[in-house]
C-alpha cells in the first residue's frame, strides 16, 4: 500500500525547503513579494472593472450594481478588487513595521522610495474609494479634498482645479477615475526602482550572520 497523500505532502515540503533563501531572515521578509502579488491582482481585476464602469455621477453607482449583478463573474472581480485593496494595506503595514523593527530605514534610498510608494498607494486608494459615488464616496471626496484649502494662498485655487469647478460634480469623478487608472502604473515604476535599489545594496541582516551560512 502506497500512501500517495503523504508523498504529495512531502513533495510540497521539499519545494518549500528548496527555496533559495538563507536562514538569517524570517517569515516577515515574505511581505514584499506578497505586495507584488497584491499589485498584480489589483491591476488585473481593476482592468476588467474599468471596462464596465461609467465615470458619470448619475450612472456610476448603477454601473457598480450592473457589474455585480449582470456581468459574468463581475461580482468576483468587484469583491476581489475591494478586499484585495484591504489586503494590500495589511501587507504594506506589516512590511513597514518589519522595516522599522529591523532598522531597514538605514538604507535611505530604499526607504525613501518605499515612502513614496506608500503615498502614491494611499492616493490611489482614495481615488478608488470615491468611484462608486455612493453617499460615503461623496462625503470622502468633499472632506479630503477640502484639506487642500488649508494651504496658504494657493489652497482655494488648487481645490477648485481638483474639483473642476466650485463644487464636487461630474468633472471631479471623471478626473478621479483617470487618476485611479493611471497611478497604478506609477506604482509599478516606483516598485521597480524600489526593488532595484534593494538588490543593489541587499536587505538588512538581523542575525548578523553570513548569508551563505547554509
Curated annotation (Swiss-Prot):
Alphabetically ordered keywords of this record: Electron transport, Heme, Iron, Membrane, Metal-binding, Mitochondrion, Mitochondrion inner membrane, Respiratory chain, Transmembrane, Transmembrane helix, Transport, Ubiquinone
Please give the InterPro entries that the UniProt record associates with this protein.
Cyt_b/b6_N (IPR005797), Cytb/b6-like_sf (IPR027387), Cytochrome_b_N_euk/bac (IPR048259), Di-haem_cyt_TM (IPR016174)
Q: What does the entry comment about cofactor binding?
A: Binds 2 heme b groups non-covalently.
Which positions bind a ubiquinone?
Answer: 199
Q: Where does heme b b562 bind?
A: 81, 180
**Subcellular compartments:** Mitochondrion inner membrane
Highest taxon listed in the record's lineage: Eukaryota
Q: Which residues cross the membrane?
A: 31-51, 75-96, 111-131, 176-196
The Swiss-Prot or TrEMBL record lists the needed cofactor(s) as: heme b
What is a GO molecular function of this protein? ubiquinol-cytochrome-c reductase activity
Describe its assembly: The cytochrome bc1 complex contains 3 respiratory subunits (MT-CYB, CYC1 and UQCRFS1), 2 core proteins (UQCRC1 and UQCRC2) and probably 6 low-molecular weight proteins.
Q: What else is known?
A: Heme 1 (or BL or b562) is low-potential and absorbs at about 562 nm, and heme 2 (or BH or b566) is high-potential and absorbs at about 566 nm.
This protein is called Cytochrome b
Amino acid at each position: 500500500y502506497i500512501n500517495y497523500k503523504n508523498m504529495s505532502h512531502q513533495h510540497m515540503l521539499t519545494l518549500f525547503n528548496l527555496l533559495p533563501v538563507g536562514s538569517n531572515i524570517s517569515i516577515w521578509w515574505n511581505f514584499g513579494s506578497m505586495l507584488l502579488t497584491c499589485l498584480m491582482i489589483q491591476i488585473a481585476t481593476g482592468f476588467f472593472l474599468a471596462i464596465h464602469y461609467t465615470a458619470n455621477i448619475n450612472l456610476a453607482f448603477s454601473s457598480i450594481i450592473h457589474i455585480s449583478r449582470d456581468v459574468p463573474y463581475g461580482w468576483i472581480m468587484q469583491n476581489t478588487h475591494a478586499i484585495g485593496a484591504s489586503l494590500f494595506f495589511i501587507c504594506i503595514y506589516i512590511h513597514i513595521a518589519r522595516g522599522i523593527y529591523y532598522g531597514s530605514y538605514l538604507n535611505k534610498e530604499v526607504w525613501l522610495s518605499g515612502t513614496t510608494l506608500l503615498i502614491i498607494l494611499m492616493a490611489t486608494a482614495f481615488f478608488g474609494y470615491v468611484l462608486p459615488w455612493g453617499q460615503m464616496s461623496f462625503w470622502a471626496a468633499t472632506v479630503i479634498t477640502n484639506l487642500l484649502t488649508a494651504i496658504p494662498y494657493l489652497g482655494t485655487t488648487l481645490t477648485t482645479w481638483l474639483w473642476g469647478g466650485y463644487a464636487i460634480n461630474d468633472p471631479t469623478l471623471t478626473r478621479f477615475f483617470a487618476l485611479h487608472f493611471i497611478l497604478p502604473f506609477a506604482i509599478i515604476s516606483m516598485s521597480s526602482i524600489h526593488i532595484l535599489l534593494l538588490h543593489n545594496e541587499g536587505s538588512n541582516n538581523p542575525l548578523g550572520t553570513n548569508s551563505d551560512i547554509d
